[in-house]
Amino acid sequence: MLRFNVRVYGLLIHDEKVLITDELIGNKNITKFPGGGLEYGEGTTDCLQREFAEELATEIEIVNHFYTTDFFVPSAFDNTQIISIYYQVKKTSNKEIKLPHGDNPVKNLRWIELKKINPDDFTFPIDKKVAELLRNKN
């Protein structure tokens, strides 16, 4: 049986910098773009808005589609194939992004200059590809 794991991520760009997160998933430290897993019955943009609200206490607006996985990537955690969808997003308010308290996998936020973004700084192969696309675009 084929099993797919759909992930949705946001590229929040401000002042020529993109937001990335450092997270603890299981016992692994992960560096990635903000976002997460699509839940059953949820659209991709709804998923991304939920993830930003839950993990970053931030409301966002979808600007445009940026990239969808176009190569095979097995999950690092289970026996599924990862399909990741990336959107460029913007905040809907001027409130500073703060990490919510409690059971939050996000441990740190960082703004990385687009011209200095390094694909090797990311954990997952799809994020590395997106970092390369961002770097080449700027």
Walk through the language-model features, giving the residues of each:
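A short coil-to-beta-strand element that immediately follows conserved catalytic motifs
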Residues: 59-68
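Short connector loops at helix/strand junctions that flank enzyme active sites
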Residues: 5, 13, 33, 60, ...
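A generic structural micro-feature
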Residues: 2-4, 30, 77-83, 103-106
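NUDIX/MutT-family hydrolases
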Residues: 88, 99-131
